């Protein structure tokens, strides 16, 4: 985090990537609109207009004067409110699906920001630099062939509380990002400004980061976003799979997934 605007929005300077593993959106033609949530993390997910998927679908329909003649099923595989952009990426996926279904363009950045500040960056694959409040996104590289392990201790973290607990909201940005974003050693020197306050509030986050870091072949271990999900970066998916197996056996109550960037 590099600052805060007068309207309360935080100024960010973040590297973001999408992964192969995630929630799934299933869209099919229908006489009228319907929305259903299934999957291991479906419990408690609203199916009314408070859901960002429904808002995104209606935004697309209104923008292009279309009737919502489709059925959408959200397969919820990611923990809720876990710092990995599940809701925002779901909304982005629905918009991409409807763009293809109706053969219409995607909304502009202002329309995306009106739905959610993290949605614009979820439209890009590869490594993307997100700046401003989320409206300034620049794709820097195609996805490196690295392996990732995502770990969540199944403990919630309050995003507003994490932001409010920050010692400083004026921090230096990353330097020479475009030249170094695929350099694992450089990535290991970068930080998540939200991580210290999250660890202080939820000690399980520190436990997870430490457990990932202790795996000999882990290159980088950090918290993702505002937590509580953390990630380990490995040179390939084989090493990530072995690490995920080890972590799941050692901590059966944690959510652990090995995946790749896309």
Per-segment meaning from a language model:
Residues 1-82, 99-100, 104-105, 143-145, ...:
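ATP-binding N-lobe of GHMP and related small-molecule kinases
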Residues 53, 82-107, 121, 125:
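DPxDG-like acidic metal-binding loop motif
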Residues 62-73, 96-115, 236-249:
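Phosphate-handling active-site elements
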Residues 231-233:
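Short hydrophobic/aromatic beta-strand micro-patches
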């Amino acid at each position: 985090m590099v600052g805060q605007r007068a309207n309360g929005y935080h100024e960010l300077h973040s590297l973001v990537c999408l992964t192969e593993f995630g929630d799934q959106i299933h869209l099919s033609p229908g006489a009228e609109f319907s929305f259903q949530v299934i999957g291991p993390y479906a419990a408690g997910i609203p199916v009314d207009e408070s859901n960002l998927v429904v808002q995104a679908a209606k935004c697309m329909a209104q923008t292009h004067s279309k009737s919502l003649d489709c059925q959408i099923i959200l397969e919820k595989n990611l923990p809720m409110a876990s710092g990995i952009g599940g809701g925002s990426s779901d909304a982005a996926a629905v918009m991409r699906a409807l763009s293809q279904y109706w053969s219409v363009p995607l909304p502009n950045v202002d329309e995306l920001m009106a739905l959610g500040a993290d949605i614009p960056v979820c439209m890009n694959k590869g490594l993307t630099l997100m700046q401003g409040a989320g409206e300034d996104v620049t794709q820097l590289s195609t996805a490196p062939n690295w392996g990732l392990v995502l770990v969540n201790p199944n403990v919630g973290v309050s995003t507003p509380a994490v932001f409010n607990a920050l010692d400083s909201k004026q921090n230096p940005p990353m330097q020479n990002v475009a030249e170094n974003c695929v350099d694992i050693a450089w990535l290991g020197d970068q930080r998540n400004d939200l991580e210290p306050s999250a660890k202080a509030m939820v000690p399980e986050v520190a436990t997870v980061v430490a457990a990932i870091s202790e795996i000999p072949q882990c290159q980088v271990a950090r918290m993702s976003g505002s937590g509580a999900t953390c990630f380990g970066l490995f040179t390939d998916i084989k090493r990530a799979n072995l690490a995920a197996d080890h972590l799941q056996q050692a901590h059966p109550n944690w959510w652990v997934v090995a995946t790749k960037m896309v």
